[in-house]
Curated annotation (Swiss-Prot):
Residue ranges of the TM segments: 11-31, 35-55, 77-97, 110-130, 140-160, 176-196
Localisation: Cell inner membrane
InterPro entries (UniProt xref): NqrDE/RnfAE, NqrDE/RnfAE_oxidrdctase, NqrE
Alphabetical keyword list: Cell inner membrane, Cell membrane, Ion transport, Membrane, NAD, Sodium, Sodium transport, Translocase, Transmembrane, Transmembrane helix, Transport, Ubiquinone
Name assigned to this protein: Na(+)-translocating NADH-quinone reductase subunit E
Organism the protein comes from: Glaesserella parasuis serovar 5 (strain SH0165) (Haemophilus parasuis)
């Protein structure tokens, strides 16, 4: 149990997808204007990562890994296309669920919901799972933890961006400029976790 807890904390703070690896920056910067929208997208990312990482772990271990199907047959060259296909299918299912049961959130997320399919944070988490050879339980914990870390980062940036509306930001830095500076300062804060070994 301690191993899974340390993996969860490590994936949130020490190896934060957005602020340590700088993955998923397109949606991270574009949807971080309102806390409510950022929170909704963060929940969607947690759900997708919490399902996509273990689903791809099952596919990798039982189909793609060297000798999984037939002795001597290595299908790892199909990793990228297979992982993207699984992620795309999961995002389509999530999109249909949000459209049916949460139409306000669905319309608020707009084009960024289908973009989760090609969000490099999702694919990065799946790639890290393969590289680090996580088992099924570890992949579930890692997927949920990585999604939680990404959500924590985007909600924090959205909160800062909302507060910046009431600040006297220089004209040359308004908009994306101050967002980059804020994200950079947040990343510096998260660097303080990098020396922690769990």
């Amino acid at each position: 149990m301690e191993h899974y807890l340390s993996l969860f904390v490590k994936s949130i703070f020490i190896e934060n997808m957005a602020l340590s690896f700088f993955l998923g920056m397109c949606t991270f910067l574009a949807v971080s204007k309102k806390v409510s929208t950022a929170f909704g997208l963060g929940i969607a990312v947690i759900v997708v990562l919490g399902i996509a990482v273990p689903a791809n772990q099952i596919v990798y271990e039982n189909i793609l890994k060297d000798g999984a199907l037939v002795e001597g047959v290595d299908l790892t060259f199909l990793n990228f296309i297979t992982f993207i296909g699984v992620i795309a299918a999961l995002v389509q299912i999530l999109e249909m669920i949000l459209d049916k049961f949460f139409p306000a959130l669905y319309s608020a997320l707009g084009i960024f919901l289908p973009l989760i399919t090609v969000n490099c944070a999702i694919f990065g988490a799946v790639s890290f799972m393969v590289q680090r050879e996580y088992n099924f339980a570890e992949s579930v914990v890692y997927g949920i933890g990585a999604g939680t870390g990404w959500m924590l980062a985007i909600v924090a940036l959205a909160g800062i961006t909302e507060k910046m509306k009431y600040s006297d930001v220089p004209a040359g830095l308004k908009g994306l400029g101050i967002t980059f500076i804020s994200a950079g300062l947040m990343a510096l804060g998260f660097m303080s976790f990098s020396g922690i070994k769990l």
